[in-house]
């Protein structure tokens, strides 16, 4: 069984420190993807959702969602029956349920994970889904850098790879979760790589 590396915990501590700054990791990378997410949820008849790596989860806040351009919070726009939020670096949401959900959403997360931890994190994400997974991954450096700790001075996107690399990585993990349909949107400096990984109809 794959386990978190020392770097995982080092990075987690660094992200916890960055989270203390009010404007950091608000979860707003989800906002431009909401129309796509709504379509994915409708297409797969998803009624329950887990946002894995939700940050401060502003898109789900009834009070704050309008300040980031959403008319309603995500759970209402997507007509969900229930949803849960998880982010190990933010105390309010640092408890991960053992439940399974119709869809697991993971945006702006994987590029923050050290390469040696990518496999077990992906496996954890997929293991919480009954039907569908929606992944959004940045394939370019971020504007933020770590201010302290082992990774001081380094870019917070510690795993920057091409979208095709990510597709191959996810497909390898998906081989043990072939009942799932996985949607991927990987965004590089001058390209967008879109993929849908699913079992082929016979």
Regions found by a protein language model. Give the residues of each.
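Short N-terminal helix/helix-N-cap motif within the alpha/beta-hydrolase-1
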Residues: 114-118
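Hydrophobic adenine-recognition pocket in adenosine-nucleotide-binding enzymes
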Residues: 109-112
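A conserved beta-strand element that flanks and buttresses the S-adenosyl-L-methionine
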Residues: 105
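Short glycine-centered segments of the SAM/dcSAM-binding site in methyltransferase folds
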Residues: 131-134
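Conserved N-terminal segment of class I S-adenosyl-L-methionine
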Residues: 1-101, 119-122, 128, 139, ...
